[in-house]
Amino acid sequence: MTEDFTPNAGYIEVKPPARPRQNIAKDNQQMRLALLRVKRYETAVQRLQEEQDRERQTARQAGRDLIKYTTSVKDHAVPELWGYLPPEKNPYALYEEENKTTGCCVIS
């Protein structure tokens, strides 16, 4: 009975085609490059989707917000518009009074 399954009993032995190692390595390299390319495309699509989902503001609304901010927030760096700070509220004036020197320094 074991003789029936031998190749000389009418069965044809089929072997896979022999592929050289170079072809296998080349195919593997091409597969890796294709996977890297797909990964780059996926990350680019994800970044574009995030950018598209970001909330947008029109130029008109941005201008209105800027005007509203500049007219409502006091900026004492422009004293012609908002006036000078009283000395007790000016932290830089207090700092200058504490650190008054005669103009000489000693380096040791």
UniProtKB/Swiss-Prot annotation:
It holds the Pfam family G-gamma. Its main location: membrane. A lipid is attached at residue 104 (S-palmitoyl cysteine). Keywords: Lipoprotein, Membrane, Methylation, Palmitate, Prenylation, Transducer. GO terms for molecular function: G-protein beta-subunit binding. It is found in: Membrane. It is a peripheral membrane protein. This is Guanine nucleotide-binding protein subunit gamma.
